């Protein structure tokens, strides 16, 4: 990014907190649509003069001046047409605007990583990087707060929060227009369905806004944690997750009131850990149930005072790790007690010693997984495989490749499960659904196709791990059985893909 700053003239705009002129630079749209930076884009005609200063200015003018109150015999048709054109203009401009507002935060993130000398930060982007952390920490904790982060946030509150970072009034007005245009209401984030709708229109902009909201929310928690802990973290770091998690800040305004120190006294607990993925977070601690209840009601007041959100207390659950399972990121996680009896011999006397060991257990929730397959039309609600009729127009090799890729991705993601037997039901559903799809395409029976394809058909549904292990070790060896049953966490899984994306 640094070597392109002199072409973008970023230093000059950033110094004066003025980003609005960047909207009229055509290379911004080249970056937005090509999703990459190279010297030829910035110096040459990146997008064939599609986004010149005059064109962008004209689009912004039309975007602001569209009139939806046209009275004519064809009013409904004209309104729908102009509404479509207005959305088109705003979407085109907002793509470039998303790149602009990301620039200062991206540079802050890069500088923070350099200051803390975090070189291999790409490993922290992986979803699976959370689970080794849970395995290491949760064995020593007692209680966990299962938090559904409240999502209704008023547009004006978000804009006012952004004013601390973007002091350009024109950019803020344009952002306010996008928010009201896309949502046409009082809440920016109302449900997962709304987020998906926003993402389809302008994924980059609204993911940035959602990440910024989460960043502001978490910065206060990090500040409280560092100020209240006896064992302050000296290398907190910045966790980089490109899609869902933009960054964690550890600096806040130093204006402290007298009552604030009372709050810090309530949360003096060195063994408190926080994890978040999308709109769900976990706050685990070794403390007592009383202190966890204080955390719960403090968080409720925190949402009300800082974001004008009135969350319901039932959105924050207090669970004991020893007798409750935690539904997080597609796994049912719990701390299980394994008891074992050891015989000890001392001279002529023998003793039976009972030993209890805590073990972090991760289970695949098979019912929700089958429900996801049913929603994607691979099976019915009972888990019986059906044909994927929308794929019958594809070539046989493409159909087999799609089913095999989905199966491998599922096994890849759930490779860290302590009980993998339930995954073979998923493999059975996908394999038979693939056979039914091919049989439906060729107007044949499933039995005939399975007999025709033979063992080659099965190879598409082997996971990469099974292929490698089958080449290195015999399947019946004890070492191989241990590896098949063992957990494997990966540091290259950035997000969970929807089954329907391949359509």
Swiss-Prot record:
One of its GO terms (biological process) is tRNA processing. Usually encoded in the trnK tRNA gene intron. Probably assists in splicing its own and other chloroplast group II introns. The keyword RNA-binding applies. Belongs to the intron maturase 2 family. MatK subfamily. This is Maturase K. Pfam families: Intron_maturas2 (PF01348), MatK_N (PF01824). The keyword Plastid applies. GO terms for molecular function: RNA binding. GO terms for cellular component: chloroplast. It is found in: Plastid, Chloroplast. Its main location: plastid. Keywords: Chloroplast, mRNA processing, Plastid, RNA-binding, tRNA processing. It comes from the Eukaryota. The gene is matK.
């Amino acid at each position: 990014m640094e070597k392109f700053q002199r072409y973008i003239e970023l230093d000059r705009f950033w110094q004066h907190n003025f980003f609005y002129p960047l909207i009229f630079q055509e290379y911004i749209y080249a970056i937005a649509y090509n999703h990459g930076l190279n010297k030829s884009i910035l110096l040459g005609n990146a997008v064939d003069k599609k986004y010149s200063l005059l064109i962008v200015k004209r689009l912004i003018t039309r975007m602001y001046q569209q009139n939806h109150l046209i009275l004519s015999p064809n009013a409904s048709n004209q309104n729908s047409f102009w509404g479509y054109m207005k959305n088109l203009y705003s979407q085109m401009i907002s793509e470039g605007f998303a790149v602009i507002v990301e620039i200062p935060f991206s540079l802050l993130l890069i500088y923070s990583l350099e200051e803390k000398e975090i070189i291999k930060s790409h490993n922290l982007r992986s979803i699976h990087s959370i689970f080794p952390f849970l395995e290491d920490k949760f064995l020593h904790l007692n209680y966990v707060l299962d938090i559904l982060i409240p999502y209704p946030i008023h547009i004006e509150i978000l804009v006012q929060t952004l004013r601390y970072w973007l002091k350009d009034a024109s950019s803020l007005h344009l952002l306010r227009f996008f928010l009201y245009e896309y949502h046409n209401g009082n809440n920016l984030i109302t449900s997962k369905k709304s987020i998906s709708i926003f993402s389809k229109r302008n994924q980059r902009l609204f993911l940035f806004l959602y990440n910024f909201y989460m960043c502001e929310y978490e910065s206060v928690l990090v500040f409280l944690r560092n100020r209240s802990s006896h064992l302050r973290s000296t290398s907190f770091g910045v966790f980089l997750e490109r899609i869902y998690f933009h960054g964690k800040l550890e600096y806040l305004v130093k204006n402290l009131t007298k009552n604030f120190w009372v709050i810090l006294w309530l949360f003096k607990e060195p063994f408190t850990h926080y994890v978040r993925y999308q709109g769900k977070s976990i706050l685990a601690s070794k403390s007592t149930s009383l202190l966890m209840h204080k955390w719960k009601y403090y968080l409720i007041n925190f949402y009300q005072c800082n974001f004008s959100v009135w969350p319901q207390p039932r959105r924050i659950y207090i669970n004991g790790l020893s007798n409750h399972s935690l539904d997080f990121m597609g796994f049912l996680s719990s701390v299980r007690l394994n008891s074992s009896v050891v015989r000890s011999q001392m001279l002529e006397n023998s003793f039976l010693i009972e030993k209890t060991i805590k073990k972090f257990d991760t289970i695949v929730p098979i019912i929700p997984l089958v429900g996801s397959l049913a929603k994607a039309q691979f099976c019915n609600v009972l888990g019986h495989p059906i044909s994927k009729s929308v794929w019958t127009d594809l070539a046989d090799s493409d159909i087999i490749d799609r089913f095999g890729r989905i199966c491998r991705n599922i096994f890849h993601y759930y490779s860290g499960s302590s009980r993998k037997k339930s995954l073979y039901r998923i493999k059975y559903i996908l394999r038979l659904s693939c056979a039914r799809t091919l049989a439906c395409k060729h107007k044949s029976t499933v039995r005939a196709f399975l007999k025709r394809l033979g063992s080659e058909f099965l190879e598409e549904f082997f996971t990469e791990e099974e292929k490698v292990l089958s080449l290195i070790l015999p399947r019946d060896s004890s070492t191989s059985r241990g590896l098949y049953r063992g957990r494997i966490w990966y540091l290259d899984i950035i997000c969970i893909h929807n089954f329907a994306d391949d359509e």
